[in-house]
Structure formats: C-alpha cells, structure tokens
Amino acid sequence: MEKKEKNIEELVVFSGQYEDCADNARIVIPDGIEEIAENAFRGFTYLSEVVLPRSLKRISACAFAGCSNLKRIEMQFGLEEILDEAFSSCSSLTSVNIPDSVKRIGEGCFEACASLSQIKLSESVVMIGSGAFAYCFNLTDVTIPDSCVLVEFNAFANCFSLEGVKLSCNMGLIDESTFEGCRSLKYVDLPTKLVKIGRRAFKGCSSLANIILPVGTSVIGFDAFADCSSLSRIAIPKDLREIEDFDAFGGCDALTDISFGGSREKWEDIMRGNILTVQKSDCSVSVPKIIFMNLE
C-alpha cells in the first residue's frame, strides 16, 4: 500500500491560524503536527493553556513569545528542540516540565518568565542557550542533568530568587555571566570536570558564602566572583594556572581565607602581575597547613 505524503499544512502550525480564539483559550494542537512555526502564537494574550501532541518535534523561534496570560504548557515525549525565545516573556507561566526527548533549549527560550518558579529539565538535554532562563525572578532551584555539556552565557542571569544549583558533572565551562546577579544563590554543586569559570560567572551573588573549586579547575575569569559580598572562603585546587585578573574577587568584603592546594611558588607565579582587591587586611592565602602570605 502506497504511503500518502502529507502537505506542509498538515505538519506545521503557522502564524495566524488560531487568531480567532476567545479569551482564556485552551488550545489543543492536533496529533500529526510536527512543528510550530516561528511567531505562530506570538503576542496572543488571550491564550491561557496549550496542549502539544506527541507528534511534535520542534517549537520554533518566538512561537509563544509574549503570551502574557499563558499559565500552562503541556509538552509530550517526542519533542526534540525548543528554539530561541520560544516562550520568552510568558509572564504568567509558573512551571514547565520539559520531556526527556528534548536535546536543545535555545537562546532566551524562557527569558523574562517572571512567574516561573519550577523547571524540570530534560534528562537528555545537551545544550542550554544563552539567556535561556535569565530574568526568571521566581525560579528557586535548578538541576542541570549530566547529559548537558554546554550552558551558554547569561543562561540564569538575574534569577533573583535562585538559591541552589546542581550543575552537570560533564560541564567543563561555566560561561560568562551564567549566574550573574543571582543575589539569593547560596549553594552551587560544581561540575567534577570543570576547567574554567568564565568572566562574571557569579558576579553579584551576594548570598554565596563558600566555594570549593573541584580538582582540574585551571582558569578563573575576570570578575568571576566580584561583589560576592558574603563570600568568606574559597578553596582553589593545585591545578589552577591562571586568574585572569584578581578583580575576580573584587568587592568580596567578607573574604578572609583563600586556600590553595599547590605550592607557594606556583601561587606566586599565578599572582605575578595581579593585584588583590579584597578589602579585608587579614585575608590570607594558605597552602596545606601553611599560611605563607598576608595579602593587604
């Protein structure tokens, strides 16, 4: 029996197809649809709930952007990609359960979802785009599964209520400004394969009190921990080879203890040309069991 080919109209929801829906509408996308096109529901302020079919593979860029009354989105296993700004500025959305089939979350995907307090990420996600969850003011905790190898810059910037983060063990980089401005952040479970902490990665995380960098961490970027005003202790492994600028700890007024796992000579090599801008005059750096210098 010959297989019937489907028309593009049978596979894709295009912009404008649901414009005549009533206020507080609940839309069920029919089975067979494989893609929701770019801008398909953008700015549909009457939309309150969307149920997506198992056949859906892709939610395209800005598909639901600016749906300010959207409270619930039901995604099904089979979805593979959620592209750039797909749900940005959906300010009434409170929780999202991303199915385990999703491998990519695009740039700004849930940016400025101000009411979003709970997010369950796909256990298969490989990449989270820049700014994906930035300005999600009510998000309190996040676990990035071990399938993920890349979280791009600004991904969780200015999530003011974020208190705890568990990062994928397979992330080698915490990118620029990933958690910048997360002023409630108290706990970070860092990746065991971490190599570099990027510029401003934790800048302004004013509730962060203690950081233990894992073995293998070799680079701390400019302003990485700047203005972490509660940070009192940081433990640095012997693998460290570069602090891009010691403004990495600028404005860390409570910092009194920097523990370094390597030799005194190696620390002095790392510090050559850097100026410690920690204000506390009693801040000390120690190698195992030996306090070897006072930094003023």
PLM-predicted stretches and their roles:
Residues 1-12, 21-35, 45-58, 68-81, ...:
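Structural signature of tandem-repeat unit edges
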Residues 16-17, 37-40, 60-63, 83-86, ...:
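Consensus positions within tandem repeat domains that build extended binding/scaffold surfaces
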Residues 42, 65, 273-275:
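Short, glycine/charged-enriched secondary-structure capping and boundary segments
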Residues 247, 268-282:
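Short, aromatic/basic amphipathic alpha-helical patches
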